[in-house]
C-alpha cells in the first residue's frame, strides 16, 4: 500500500468498519497510541495509524514473498473459518481455521509425523486400498483420516514451520502467538481495542470482530503476497 493511495484506502476502511473497536470499558491500555481520544461509549481506532502500519506489513509481506518465504494464516473462530480458508488458498498460504493444537509449531517433529500419516491414509483411500481390508480396520482408519482432515487440512503440504504467521484474532489464538514468539517466527496480526499490540511483530489496529473489516485487511495482505510472488517469478 503506497502512501499516495492512503486517502482512498481510508475511505474504504471507514466503509468496512475497520475503525470500530469495543466498548470503552473493554479495552487494553497498551492500544491507546492507536486510538482516537475522547470517545465515551465505543473505542475508535485512528485509521491513519492503521493505514501506515498496514502499509508496512504489506511491504514486508511483498518482500518476504519475493524471497520465497512461506506464510501461514491463523484464525480459528467459527465465524471466520470459511474466510480464512478461502483467503489462504487464493494466496497459496498454509492455514489453520478450526482449532490450534498445542505444539503445532513448537513440536513440529510430531506434527510432521502426523502429516505423513495423513498423506499415507489419503493415498490409500484414493487407491481403493480400504476396499480390501477388514471392516473394523477400515473404520479405524477412516476415523483417523477424518480427524487428520479436520485439524490439518490447511497445512497438509507444509514441509517445515512457516516463515511468517498472520493472525486475525489475538485472544482466540493466543497459544499460537506464544509458539511463534518462542520460535522467533515473525508475526503480523490484527489488534482490536482489547488487544496487546506488543504481542505481534507487526500489529495492524483494526476491528477483528467484523467479517467485512477482516476481509478488507486480509485482501490487502494477500494482494501484497501475490505481488511479491509474481515479481519473484518474473526475475
From Swiss-Prot:
Its main location: plastid. It comes from Zygnema circumcarinatum (Green alga). InterPro entries: Ribosomal_uS2, Ribosomal_uS2_bac/mit/plastid, Ribosomal_uS2_CS, Ribosomal_uS2_flav_dom_sf. Keywords: Chloroplast, Plastid, Ribonucleoprotein, Ribosomal protein. GO terms for molecular function: structural constituent of ribosome. The keyword Secreted does not apply. Coiled coil: none annotated. PROSITE patterns: RIBOSOMAL_S2_1 (PS00962). The keyword Transcription regulation does not apply. GO terms for cellular component: chloroplast; mitochondrial small ribosomal subunit. GO terms for biological process: translation. This is Small ribosomal subunit protein uS2c. Belongs to the universal ribosomal protein uS2 family. It comes from the Eukaryota. It is found in: Plastid, Chloroplast.
Amino acid at each position: 500500500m503506497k502512501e499516495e493511495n492512503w486517502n482512498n484506502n481510508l475511505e474504504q476502511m471507514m466503509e468496512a468498519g475497520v475503525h470500530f473497536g469495543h466498548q470503552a470499558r473493554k479495552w487494553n491500555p497498551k492500544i491507546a497510541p492507536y486510538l482516537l481520544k475522547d470517545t465515551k461509549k465505543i473505542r475508535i481506532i485512528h485509521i491513519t495509524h492503521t493505514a501506515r502500519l498496514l502499509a508496512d506489513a504489506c511491504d514486508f509481506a511483498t518482500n518476504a514473498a519475493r524471497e520465497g518465504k512461506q506464510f501461514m494464516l491463523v484464525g480459528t473462530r467459527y465465524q471466520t473459518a470459511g474466510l480464512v480458508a478461502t483467503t489462504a488458498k487464493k494466496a497459496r498460504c498454509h492455514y489453520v481455521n478450526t482449532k490450534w493444537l498445542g505444539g503445532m509449531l513448537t513440536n513440529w517433529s510430531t506434527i510432521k509425523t502426523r502429516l505423513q500419516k495423513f498423506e499415507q491414509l489419503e493415498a490409500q483411500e484414493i487407491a481403493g486400498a480400504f476396499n480390501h481390508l477388514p471392516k473394523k480396520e477400515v473404520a479405524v482408519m477412516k476415523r483417523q483420516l477424518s480427524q487428520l482432515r479436520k485439524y490439518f487440512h490447511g497445512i497438509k503440504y507444509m514441509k517445515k514451520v512457516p516463515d511468517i504467521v498472520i493472525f486475525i484474532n489475538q485472544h482466540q489464538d493466543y497459544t499460537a502467538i506464544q509458539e511463534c514468539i518462542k520460535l522467533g517466527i515473525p508475526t503480523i496480526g490484527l489488534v482490536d481495542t482489547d488487544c496487546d499490540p506488543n504481542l505481534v511483530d507487526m500489529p495492524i489496529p483494526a476491528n477483528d470482530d467484523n467479517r467485512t473489516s477482516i476481509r478488507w485487511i486480509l485482501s490487502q495482505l494477500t494482494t501484497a503476497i501475490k505481488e511479491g510472488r509474481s515479481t519473484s517469478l518474473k526475475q
